């Protein structure tokens, strides 16, 4: 059984030093500590990717806190399941949680349920926000394309670029671009 450590910070205000010190105090050798400094939403985690390649069945990964392993609950659960499938246990120092043994399997099951509930909650909030935005008149999707012929017809009738832009709800620069393209052709 080899012991590895993983530490991650998601903002510049957070420090890896405290996490690394806790991992060393727990018996992890310095060359077996993998770290990432990235935003919480970033999926580019070189340290975690290296750790995934190094661990083997029977190994243990120590992490200072639950929230340091994954970007969110769903990500953390996915990683725990991935390591569990490899026969690798994950232990969280501060939280006193370990994924090995029968109790560990129960913890993984409970955390999976929490992750599923979190995904549903996020989906509900997203849909509520989308509905509220629609009620406020905010349009979704790609902007409609400008009918060049309408712009050219209005211009031929003597309508100015500013008025065309206003009538068609487009930028004046778009009107000028269409007129310029027409002159060039």
UniProtKB/Swiss-Prot annotation:
Active site residues per record: 10 (o-(5'-phospho-dna)-serine intermediate)
GO biological process: DNA integration
Keywords assigned: DNA integration, DNA recombination, DNA-binding, Transposable element
Superkingdom of origin: Bacteria
CDD domains cross-referenced by the UniProt entry: SR_ResInv
Gene3D superfamilies: 6.10.250.10, Homeodomain-like, Resolvase, N-terminal catalytic domain
PANTHER family, per the entry: DNA-INVERTASE FROM LAMBDOID PROPHAGE, RESOLVASE HOMOLOG YNEB
All copies of domain Resolvase/invertase-type recombinase catalytic, residue ranges: 2-137
Family note: Belongs to the site-specific recombinase resolvase family.
DNA-binding region boundaries: 161-180
Classification via InterPro entries: Homeodomain-like_sf, Recombinase_CS, Resolv_N, Resolvase-like_N_sf, Resolvase_HTH_dom, SSR_resolvase
Designated name of the protein: Transposon Tn3 resolvase
Keyword Iron-sulfur among record annotations: no
A GO MF term: DNA strand exchange activity
Pfam families, per database record: HTH_7, Resolvase
Chain's role: Resolvase catalyzes the resolution (a site-specific recombination) of the cointegrated replicon to yield the final transposition products.
